[in-house]
C-alpha cells in the first residue's frame, strides 16, 4: 500500500473524532475521544512508511468499530447519567 499523505492522516483523525462524538453514552464518548487523541499524539513522530501504513490501517479498522458501536449504542440506549442530564432551572 502506498504511503499516506499528511492530508489523509488528518482526514482520518477528523473522521474518528466526528464519529466518536456520536456515542450516546457519555463514558464511551469521552473514552473514545481521549483514546483517538492519545493514539495520534503518541504516533506523531513516526517516519517509517511501513509503520505508518500499519497505523493507518489500524485507525481505519478502529473507525469501522466505532461506527458499529455507535449504531449498537443507539439501538440499545441506556438511562442517561447525571453528567448527561439537562439541568433543571
UniProtKB/Swiss-Prot annotation:
Domain of life assignment: Eukaryota
One Pfam family matching this protein: Complex1_LYR
Entry keyword set: Mitochondrion, Nucleus
Record protein name field: LYR motif-containing protein 4
Biological source species: Danio rerio (Zebrafish)
Disulfide feature: none
Similarity comment text for this entry: Belongs to the complex I LYR family.
Main localization (coarse): mitochondrion
GO terms for cellular component: L-cysteine desulfurase complex; mitochondrion; nucleus
Subcellular compartments: Mitochondrion; Nucleus
Keyword Nucleus among UniProt keywords: yes
Pathway: Cofactor biosynthesis; iron-sulfur cluster biosynthesis
InterPro entries hit by this protein: Complex1_LYR_dom (IPR008011), Complex1_LYR_LYRM4 (IPR045297), ISC_assembly_LYR (IPR051522)
Native organism taxonomy: Eukaryota, Metazoa, Chordata, Craniata, Vertebrata
Function: Required for nuclear and mitochondrial iron-sulfur protein biosynthesis.
Record carries keyword Mitochondrion: yes
Any GO BP: iron-sulfur cluster assembly
